[in-house]
Amino acid sequence: MIDYERSNTTKNINTHHHNPPPSSSSSDLLPDGNGTAVTQKRKRRPAGTPDPEAEVVSLSPRTLLESDRYVCEICNQGFQRDQNLQMHRRRHKVPWKLLKRETNEEVRKRVYVCPEPTCLHHNPCHALGDLVGIKKHFRRKHSNHKQWICERCSKGYAVQSDYKAHLKTCGTRGHSCDCGRVFSRVESFIEHQDTCTVRRSQPSNHRLHEQQQHTTNATQTASTAENNENGDLSIGPILPGHPLQRRQSPPSEQQPSTLLYPFVTNGSIELQLLPSRNCADETSLSLSIGTMDQKTMSEVEKKSYEKGETSLEREEARRETKRQIEIAELEFAEAKRIRQHARAELHKAHLFREEASRRISATMMQITCHNCKQHFQAPAALVPPPPQTHCTDESTSLAVSYMSSATTEGEKASDRASS
């Protein structure tokens, strides 16, 4: 394992605490009113108050910046945690006696202090109880080497876990406050909301905005009811026991009919919507709007129809192109097949030619007379090679003709020599 620098002397945190907290490893017995002993429940120690009996370890900055703190003594593979190293050792299948620690050694808990003198965690009273924690703290606060850089926002991180957490929220708004600040961590966002001044002044403004919005909605509802289809409704408070009544107006009257309700005399608010005086103007306006809507709809339908035709033409052209590509691929495959067949025929013709020449040479070697052999070698060289389409029978007949001529000439030469 890699050696690490400890403090010159093993410090006891009891000397730095005025009132040391009780140890979490021991359970105190408190007497109750009857004198019986009651076991005190163990409480979790708050952050920054380590165990007073723990061993204080001070590591050098070089050791804290190392990526692999624990190294296997068998294969020299490094790990960041001791638990990972112990799990790795089991894979080597080493006998348990070699891995078992000596029972005489007393295992003490260790706490780690920051080597930076100006840091809060340099004091043993605020030491960190985890090696990974002190390494992350030193890299975040006291190291300028930011190894992991975000490709989107070019923000650098010295700790890989912080970089991975940033990647999950990078490119999004994250947790945004009303003051404009954006937080990637929920904890930081909650802490900021507790101290944000903009959020405190928001409820009163929000209530005022709700009141204004409620008034606006009521006004819009009244104006919408005035522009209804009939234009002759008069809405008032309906009292129980009084049915709705409609007054029938003669045809000569131009005013539209209204609904009559008994009015309330106790001073309550009455919402009464009367028809507008310019009823003819409203009718003409609605007709003109309807005409414009029809024109707009016709234009939209025409454009959509043109777009549909264009899309159909494009689809048809795409299909035709695809069909032509398939035909070209088939023709190319057929051409490749014809070429391979032609190559095979040419190879067969070459083989036939070589076989014929070999047989002719073998026949000429059987002639015993040296003069005749030289005499017939020259005409054989001048004979053109057989065409590629000749078969084996033609080459054989040619070789037989050469043999017969050679035999005849040999007999004539022997007769001359004997005479």
UniProtKB/Swiss-Prot annotation:
Knocked-out gene: effects: No visible phenotype. Accelerated growth and slightly early flowering.
Record region (SHR-binding): 185-197
GO cellular component: nucleus
Name used for this protein in its record: Protein indeterminate-domain 14
Physiological role: Transcription factor regulating starch metabolism by binding directly to the promoter of QQS. The IDD14beta isoform attenuates the transcription factor activity by competitively forming heterodimers with reduced DNA-binding capacity. Regulates lateral organ morphogenesis and gravitropic responses. Has a redundant role with IDD16 in directing leaf and floral organ morphogenesis. Involved in the establishment of auxin gradients through the regulation of auxin biosynthesis and transport.
GO molecular function: DNA-binding transcription factor activity; transcription cis-regulatory region binding; zinc ion binding
Pfam families given in the database record: C2CH-3rd_BIRD-IDD, C2CH-4th_BIRD-IDD, C2H2-2nd_BIRD-IDD, zf-C2H2
Upregulation: Not regulated by auxin.
Region described as Disordered: spans on this chain: 1-58, 200-259, 298-318
Keywords: Coiled coil, DNA-binding, Metal-binding, Nucleus, Repeat, Transcription, Transcription regulation, Zinc, Zinc-finger
SMART domains registered for this protein in UniProt: ZnF_C2H2
UniProt-listed InterPro entries: C2CH-3rd_BIRD-IDD, C2CH-4th_BIRD-IDD, C2H2-2nd_BIRD-IDD, IDD1-16, Znf_C2H2_sf, Znf_C2H2_type
Domain remarks: The coiled-coil domain (311-350) is involved in dimerization.
Compartmental location: Nucleus
Chain intervals annotated as zinc finger (CCHC-type): 175-198
